[in-house]
C-alpha cells in the first residue's frame, strides 16, 4: 500500500510576519532557506513512491516465480503419470486385450516356433556329439602325437616339496611315515600275489586281443623296495636321519621306453656342493622301471595295474642345512630339462635334516 505523505510545512503567513522588511540580507537568507526546505520535501516525497514501486515489483516477481514452479511441478507430475499409463497399457491393454503389444494367439505362435527351433537345434547338436563319440575309443586315445613325456611324482607328500624334520623330534617326521604307509598299502605282497601275475623281467608285457578285453597286470611287491619298504624299518629311515623318498612315473596309455631300454632315475645336488649328498641307495638296485610294466592299457581294461616305483634312500646327507635335490629320468626320448615345468622328467625338492 502506498502511504499518503503530508507536507509538514508551516501554514503560510503574511509576508510581513515572516521576514523583517528593514533587513534585506535577512530577508534573502530566509527566502533561500525556505526554498531549500521545499526542495528537500519534494525530493523526500518523490523517493518514497519509488521505493514502494520497487517493493511492489519484487512482490509481483515472487508471485510469478511461485506460479511458474507450481505449474512446472504439475507438468512433471502429469508427464510421469502419462508415462506410467503408457507402460501399463503396454503391459496390458484391456481394450485391445494385448500384452506387450501382442495378443494371446500371437504369443502362442511365437512359443510354438521357438520350441521347435530350439528342439531342432538341440537334436542337431546331440547328433553331432553322438557321431563324434562313435569315432573315439574309450580305451585308447585317438591322437597321441602331442602327449608329453612322462612326468614324475614323489611320496611322501611334503608341503612345497620341502622335507624339514628333526631326527630327535618324532612329531616332525611322523606324518611322513604315515603318508608312506598309506601309499604302500596297495603294494603289499599278499595283495599283489592275489590280484596280479608274476611277469618275466626285462621285456614288454604285450597283451593282444580286443581293446575292451580286461588286461592283466604285473606284480610290484612292497618287498622290492627293501630298506625303504617299511617292513624292515617302520620309520623308513626318518628316525635315523636317512630318509626314504619314493618316485614314480605318471601313467601314459601305450607308453613304451624307446629302444627297449628301461628308464632310469638319477639324483644329485641341484645347486651347491655335490658332497652335501655323499651316498644314495636305490631300490630296486637297478634304479630303473622294468620293461614288464609297459605298456599301460588304460584304467578301463588295466584295472589292477600297479605303477612301478623307485625308492631313493639318502643314507649320507649333510645335516642342519637345506640341500636342494634334483632327481631326473634318464632314457631315450625322455625330456628332463623343461624350464617351465618342474615335473616333466624330473622333480626338485629340498632336504633339511636337523639333529
Swiss-Prot record:
Nuclear-side positions: 1-108
PANTHER family: PROTEIN ATP1B4 (PTHR11523:SF12), SODIUM/POTASSIUM-DEPENDENT ATPASE BETA SUBUNIT (PTHR11523)
The keyword Transmembrane is assigned to this record: yes
Sequence ranges on the Perinuclear space membrane side: 130-355
InterPro entries the UniProt entry points to: Na/K_ATPase_sub_beta, Na/K_ATPase_sub_beta_sf
Sequence similarity: Belongs to the X(+)/potassium ATPases subunit beta family.
Biased composition (Acidic residues): 50-68
Gene name in the database record: ATP1B4
Region (Disordered): 33-77
Record field: transmembrane: 109-129
Keywords assigned: Membrane, Nucleus, Signal-anchor, Transcription, Transcription regulation, Transmembrane, Transmembrane helix
Primary role: May act as a transcriptional coregulator during muscle development through its interaction with SNW1. Has lost its ancestral function as a Na,K-ATPase beta-subunit.
Biological processes annotated in GO: potassium ion transport; regulation of DNA-templated transcription; sodium ion transport
Pfam families assigned to the protein according to its UniProt record, in alphabetical order: Na_K-ATPase
PROSITE patterns in the record: ATPASE_NA_K_BETA_1, ATPASE_NA_K_BETA_2
Originating species: Bos taurus (Bovine)
Protein name according to UniProt: Protein ATP1B4
One GO term describing the cellular component: sodium:potassium-exchanging ATPase complex
